[in-house]
């Protein structure tokens, strides 16, 4: 009986609605006096934290988790248009992150905290819950293996063979003879795209999360006969 070794890469991607949004908020105050900018940044951050604590509940949300950095103060000496170096300017900064399960509540909160002095929105990360991630990862992995079986079967049929049997399975690159851009271990990855329109405070904030892509790949070696 004729047997042929076939080695292929199976891949699968799927898209899922975002379930969590982590907002990164920064407080930054500039001024000529170190103590003043420190006090102003601390006050703004305290108000920001109070708004988070009022919404925080690990189980029911809308904020399920949050963190806050301490105050850092840096300084620099700017130059004017005539090339003269000016007096020291101090900058007090604090970073805050808050994870939301309710995107409408997130919009309302950003609209509220944007009114605080020195507060700016650094960005928003979209994600799935851990439970959803575990479930969809398992499914995507299985489907990537199914894709490998389908490819191998097609190749086998093209050379007149009818059955394929897997003899090795591994992360991409670990079988040693599959050329691809990805080398080494390959874990399912989560990618997201979203748009964030931060207008004036009076106009409000509009968030439009897009679906999250979960992808997986696997190398499989078969004996075809």
At which residue positions do the language-model features occur?
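Short, charge-dense linear interaction motifs
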Residues: 1-225
């Amino acid at each position: 009986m004729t047997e042929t070794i076939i080695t292929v890469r199976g891949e699968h991607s799927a898209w899922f609605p975002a379930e969590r949004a982590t907002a990164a908020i920064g407080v930054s105050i500039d001024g000529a006096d170190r103590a003043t900018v420190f006090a102003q940044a601390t006050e703004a951050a305290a108000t920001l934290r109070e708004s988070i604590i009022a919404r925080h509940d690990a189980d029911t949300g809308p904020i399920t988790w949050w963190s806050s950095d301490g105050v850092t103060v840096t300084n620099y000496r700017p130059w004017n248009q005539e090339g003269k170096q000016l007096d020291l300017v101090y900058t007090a900064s604090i970073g805050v992150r808050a994870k939301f399960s309710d995107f409408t509540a997130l919009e309302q909160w950003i609209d509220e905290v944007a009114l605080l002095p020195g507060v700016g929105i650094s960005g928003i990360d979209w994600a799935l819950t851990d439970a959803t991630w575990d479930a969809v990862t398992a499914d995507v992995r299985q489907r990537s293996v199914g894709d490998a079986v389908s490819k191998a079967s097609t190749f086998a049929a093209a050379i007149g063979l009818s059955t394929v049997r897997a003899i090795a399975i591994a992360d991409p690159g670990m079988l040693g003879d599959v050329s691809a851009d990805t080398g080494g271990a390959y874990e399912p990855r989560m990618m997201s795209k979203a748009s964030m329109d931060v207008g004036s405070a009076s106009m409000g904030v509009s968030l439009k999360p897009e679906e999250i892509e979960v992808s997986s790949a696997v190398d499989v070696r078969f004996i075809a006969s």
